[in-house]
Amino acid sequence: KDLALKALEKVGMVAFKDRHISELSGGQLQRVFIARALAQEAEWLLLDEPFAGIDATSEKIIIELLKQLRDEGKSIVIVHHDLHKVQSYFDDIVLINKEVVAFGTVSEVFTANNMGRAYGEAISEMISLGGGTNVK
């Protein structure tokens, strides 16, 4: 019980400890799921689209929490598809299209060639026209 309360405190959800899970918002629910992993003393967190369906405030809270956990030595793997936020959110990225296209830092991986290989010619053309991403 102490571990659970400590984990809820870390994610800012202690005030909601007596609420039923169905009463939580999307962002609150994501933080509870992270607390669950922390209570199990997980060294790795695997998160599938943790920012889907939540508001900007919750997203900011969660990304700050994840950065704090990273700084504490936790390893975090996140599935994420919003290319506009990749540079500010992640240290390293993997581009996958049925197989690994590229892995490395954002600046190493976010190239027009890699993006074209991962997402097809349409995004490659968009990038070359200067639309929408910070791809080199």
Language-model features: where?
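Catalytic Walker B motif of ABC-type/P-loop ATPase nucleotide-binding domains
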Residues: 45-48
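Conserved ABC ATPase signature
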Residues: 20-24, 28
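H-loop (His-switch) and adjacent beta-strand-loop-beta switch element
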Residues: 93-105
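H-loop/switch region of ABC-family ATPase nucleotide-binding domains
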Residues: 80-81
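ABC ATPase nucleotide-binding domains
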Residues: 112-113, 117-136
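Conserved ABC ATPase "signature" region
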Residues: 1-16
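Helix N-cap at the start of a conserved alpha-helix in ABC-type nucleotide-binding domains
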Residues: 56-58
